[in-house]
């Protein structure tokens, strides 16, 4: 039996599929990135994962249509939170974002000067809610686990 914190036994609870009301998935970028779910972008070092995500962030920041979308699928400009442990904002991230034509007021970073950020950090939720961010990029995600 799995224990919860403080060694309280976990109680078995089940739900039948017949008791679940199915709902539609909402998409940030159909069929690649759903809203409210973790999406991983995998590739070898140097494949351009960070550059791709910054290009998407730039398009979202302007409300421009994403690749493979219809031209009429542009929407409202969105705020994106970008966190990275591999590149500096001033010499890599912001120049790439600017080169992709992004709106610098809509790309934000959570400062980690005093405390490193982790995946479950309340500052992420606070930033998403306060700035109405629609996309959180953790590059690489493995640096934020723990």
Residue ranges and their predicted role:
Residues 52, 56:
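Hydrophobic positions on the alpha1 helix immediately C-terminal to the Walker A/P-loop
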Residues 38:
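Walker A (P-loop) ATP-phosphate-binding motif of ABC ATPase nucleotide-binding domains
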Residues 59-77:
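Post-Walker A helix-loop "phosphate-sensing" segment adjacent to the P-loop in P-loop NTPases
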Residues 1-19:
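A short, basic N-terminal segment
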Residues 42:
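Residues at the beta-strand->loop junction immediately N-terminal to the Walker
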Residues 4-9, 24, 28-30, 45-47, ...:
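Conserved inter-motif catalytic segment of the P-loop NTP-binding fold
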Residues 34:
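Residues immediately N-terminal to the Walker A/P-loop in ABC ATPase nucleotide-binding domains
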